[in-house]
Every structure is written in C-alpha cells, then in structure tokens.
Amino acid sequence: WLSLLFLRFWLPATFDLLSWEPASLFPVSPVLLLDRISWPYALALSTLALAAILTDISRSTETNRLTWVGSLAFTALGILAAMAGNPLTLMLAWAALDLIELVIMLLRVNPVEQREQVVITFSARAAGILALAAAAGLSSEIPLSFTQIAPQSSIFLLLGAGLRLGVFPLHLPFLEQAPLQRGLGTLFTLLPAG
C-alpha cells in the first residue's frame, strides 16, 4: 500500500514485464502503465485488501493465513489488471484472476447448484477474454492499444467489458449464497469489477 502511495510522485511510469520473441509473431509484449488514470484504481484495490485483512484480524480469534494469501494474490492480480498498459496484459491479468477465483470458489462451495453457478460465471468472464482477443485479432493492421482502437474492434471491446462486469448475461451474483468469509467475499465481489 505504501509503495503505491509513493509511486504517485513518479507518474507516469511504464514497466515492461517481458520481451516476447519473435517480434513478427508477438508485435506487443506485456506492459504495466501507472498513470493518473490507473493509479487511483490500484490504490483503491490495495486499500480494499488492507481493509479486508485488518477487519479480518479484528473479527476473528484465530487468523486464517490461507485467506490472507488468497486475498493478497487476488488483489495483486487486480492491480495488474488496473495497471495494464495494453490489451494483452489485460487479458493475461483477467485470465489469472478468473482462474484463482474459480479454484478458490470450487474449493469453498459445496452444493452442486452453487458449483454450477460458479462455472457459469467463470464461462461468462472467459467469454469476455475471448471478446477482447477477437478485438485484438480484428485490429491486425495496427497493434491494439488503449490509445488506438480500430472501429471494427470497438464492439468486441464493449462486449468483453460487459461480460466481465456481469452485464451480459443478466444474472444475480452467486456470492450471496456462497459460504465465503467476509473479507475474501468482498474482494471477490469488488475486484473483478475494478
């Protein structure tokens, strides 16, 4: 949390994660961008995780370190998604977020009906990633970035965001019935929307 607070003084900052080779096959590589737009989101996500952990400490007599690890890992991936400098980085962060959420939810949810709803939600979010990949494929003449969006790919970007936020398909969040602890359940509800 403090590191994000101090990074405010060095905006904008770009961090190259990897250099994928060959450049003819991978025209863009994963990049993190910390600017005036992504910094407040990253700080809000880290503050949310800090609040969830602090309230978890004050609420329970024994601390569950696995819940803390899940919360911190999920928050770190949410911050990566908020700081994504290009759609490739966003797709990778979304996929990692979805896989961690799927594993944790399937381990914690017992009735078959709730597991089915977890898989349906995961499938809708995976379709959002595929829509973003389709947008990247349609803009093959110029590499897809958040500054240059081809007109034919904008509908797929909108569809991908709608699927990620739960707008399409219209469904109630499954976390109302899921037996999750308050801190982890709050993070699972708010982080993917961030």
Where do the model's predicted regions map?
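Membrane-interface helix-cap regions at the ends of transmembrane helices
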Residues: L5-W10, D56-I57, A136-P143, A193-G194
